[in-house]
Structure formats: structure tokens, C-alpha cells
């Protein structure tokens, strides 16, 4: 006894509709990834910790007073309590084989007591490479330059203002998109009556990335509050 299975005929119109639906679903899956990559290149690179010291401490830097050369990326007001008169740094964050960021910065404390001064910084971010239909290779990129002024407004209190200009390009021949933002910082620093009064504690506050959109995307604005205790047991050992 033979068994026959009836299969309904699929008209050309239904086949075309099904194909369009598949393409639409594929595009909807790829679109968030594409937009996410654009977001990193245009604005979110500001959230990447550029220096090894802060990255090794889970990205903290709001209340650290001995990282003056990179403090402009975290909280420039802490430079007022640095033991150094001036400093400079350069670092390269090799995020993976496709992403990378160069950063450089310096600071200088003015006057005999160094109660005020300035700092400048630069960051350049390169996104992953992609290929056009003709095989040409390209990638998105973004960079920023910033300058900060810090000052002791009281014996243990310092404030800072950072002005930043950002620019991004989705690809080589795309129009450059620019934006301006500011950071506000504050630090309160006091010595402790232990370890020959060399120990200290600090509280830091920062309102960062307050400004206009970059390439149609909002900047990753944030508010941060942190604290740190410095316990120098010797010249070579500290917590």
C-alpha cells in the first residue's frame, strides 16, 4: 500500500515574501552590532581606561594623588596634592588585535607651593578594520584633545575644570564629526597621624563628559565618587 504525501505548492509570490523576511531578519540582527561598533568609535572610547595603573585597579583614579601624569583622564583636581612638580606619560591600550588606543598627557604645577597648575592630554582610538565591496580596507577612528586647570581653593580642597574637543570619522572619506565637552572635578585630601604622618586619605568627585552629541550619539556622561587611603610603610612598600 503506497502512502502519498501532499505538499502544497508555494507560489512565486510567497517565495519572494519569505526571502524578503529572511533578509529583514538578518539585517535586524546585524544592525545592533554595526551601530554598537559606530558607538565605540564615536563616543564610547571615552570610557576606556587609558593607563595601566588605573586599569590594574579596576579603572579607579578619582581619588589617587600619585598618578598626576594621567589624572586628566580621571580627576584633574588630584594633581594639586601630587608630590611631583611636573610629569608626562604615554600609553597604548591594546584592547585586542583589532582595537587600540594611544594616549599621552602631561601636567605642571605652577608656583613655589604648586597650589595650581595645568594639564593637557590626547587620545586616539582606532576601531576594527572592515572591507568595502571592492576589497578596500578601512576603519573608524576617533580622537580628542583636552586641557585642564586645577587649583587649591582651601587647605585640603582642590577643584578642576577640563575642556575637551572630540572628533570622529566613521570611515576614511566620511565627514568629520566634532563635539565639545567638559569635566568638573573636586578632591579633599588629609594626612593621617600614623606612619610619621606620611599616611593620608582622599575623597574625589568627578562629573565627566558633559557636552553635545558626537556623530549623533550622546557622550557617556557620568558622575563618580571615590575614596583612597595611602599607607607608605617604607620607600619601597605602600598600600
Language-model regions: role of each:
Residues 26-33:
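Bacterial N-terminal signal peptides
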Residues 4-7, 30:
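Secreted/luminal cysteine- and crosslink-motif detector
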Residues 38-239:
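Subset of outer-membrane beta-barrel
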Residues 16-25:
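Bacterial N-terminal signal peptides that target proteins for export
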Residues 6-17:
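Short, Lys/Arg-enriched N-terminal segments with co-localized hydrophobic residues
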Amino acid at each position: 500500500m503506497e502512502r502519498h504525501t501532499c505538499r502544497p505548492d508555494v507560489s512565486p509570490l510567497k517565495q519572494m515574501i519569505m526571502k524578503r523576511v529572511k533578509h529583514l531578519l538578518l539585517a535586524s540582527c546585524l544592525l545592533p552590532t554595526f551601530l554598537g561598533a559606530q558607538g565605540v568609535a564615536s563616543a564610547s572610547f571615552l570610557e576606556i581606561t587609558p593607563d595601566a595603573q588605573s586599569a590594574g585597579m579596576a579603572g579607579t583614579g578619582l581619588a589617587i594623588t600619585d598618578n598626576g601624569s594621567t589624572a586628566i583622564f580621571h580627576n584633574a583636581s588630584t594633581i594639586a596634592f601630587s608630590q611631583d612638580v611636573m610629569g608626562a606619560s604615554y600609553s597604548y591600550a591594546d584592547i585586542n588585535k583589532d582595537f587600540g588606543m594611544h594616549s599621552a598627557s602631561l601636567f605642571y604645577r605652577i608656583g613655589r607651593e604648586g597650589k595650581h597648575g595645568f594639564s593637557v592630554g590626547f587620545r586616539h582610538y582606532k576601531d576594527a578594520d572592515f572591507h568595502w565591496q571592492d576589497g578596500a580596507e578601512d576603519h573608524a577612528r576617533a580622537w580628542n584633545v583636552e586641557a585642564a586647570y586645577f587649583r587649591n581653593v582651601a587647605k585640603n580642597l582642590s577643584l578642576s575644570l577640563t575642556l575637551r574637543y572630540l572628533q570622529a570619522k566613521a570611515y576614511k572619506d566620511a565627514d568629520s564629526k566634532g563635539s565639545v565637552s567638559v569635566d568638573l572635578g573636586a578632591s579633599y585630601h588629609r594626612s593621617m597621624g600614623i606612619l610619621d604622618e606620611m599616611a593620608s586619605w582622599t575623597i574625589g568627585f568627578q562629573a565627566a563628559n558633559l557636552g553635545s552629541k558626537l556623530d549623533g550619539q550622546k557622550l557617556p556622561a557620568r558622575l563618580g565618587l571615590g575614596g583612597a587611603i595611602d599607607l607608605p610603610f617604607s620607600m619601597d612598600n605602600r598600600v
